[in-house]
Amino acid sequence: MFSGASAINLDAKGRIAIPKRYRESLHACHNNQLVITVDIQSSCLLLYPIHEWEQVAAKLASLSDTQPTERAIKRMLLGYAHECELDGNGRMLLPPPLRQYANLDKRAMLVGQLNKFELWDEAAWQQQIEQSRIAILNEDLAANERLADFSL
């Protein structure tokens, strides 16, 4: 389970280093293997441990090739999907098309989302957080059945 937001940097070769706090789990449970793809709703990347990606791929396989929206989702997620393995220093190379999609240049944020990570350009992440905060403040949470009794 992954949580927390970590500021990270891309090196000159387009590599990121996964923070140490996640590396042991990625090594022990997922053999250092990840799949990177795009987020179809935001300008960020999604990093799935290989076993989590297999579940996503099974869901994608169930989508129709004849229904345009379903086909477009498959095309985006599978077309950009890139398998990678962490090196001995916990680094992974981000392919140029994926870096371009998420506008990643130097400074980035790696955000744990339970079963996966999101990878954001740092400025885009800050903007997204502010937009989310405002949206939550303006939302009538009681009107949302799923959130009406939600408490932390």
From Swiss-Prot:
Keyword Repeat included in the entry's annotation: yes
Chief location of this protein within or outside the cell: cytoplasm
Domain SpoVT-AbrB: 5-52, 81-124
A single Gene Ontology CC term: nucleoid
Keywords: Cytoplasm, DNA-binding, Repeat, Transcription, Transcription regulation
Localization per record: Cytoplasm, Nucleoid
Entries under InterPro entries matching the protein: MraZ, MraZ_C, MraZ_dom, MraZ_N, MraZ_sf, SpoVT-AbrB_dom, SpoVT-AbrB_sf
BP GO terms, sorted: negative regulation of DNA-templated transcription initiation
Record-level Gene Ontology MF annotations: DNA-binding transcription factor activity; transcription cis-regulatory region binding
Entries under NCBIfam families matching the protein: division/cell wall cluster transcriptional repressor MraZ
Family: Belongs to the MraZ family.
PANTHER family reported for this sequence: TRANSCRIPTIONAL REGULATOR MRAZ (PTHR34701:SF1)
Subunit record text: Forms oligomers.
This protein's name: Transcriptional regulator MraZ
Taxonomic classification: Bacteria, Pseudomonadati, Pseudomonadota, Gammaproteobacteria, Alteromonadales
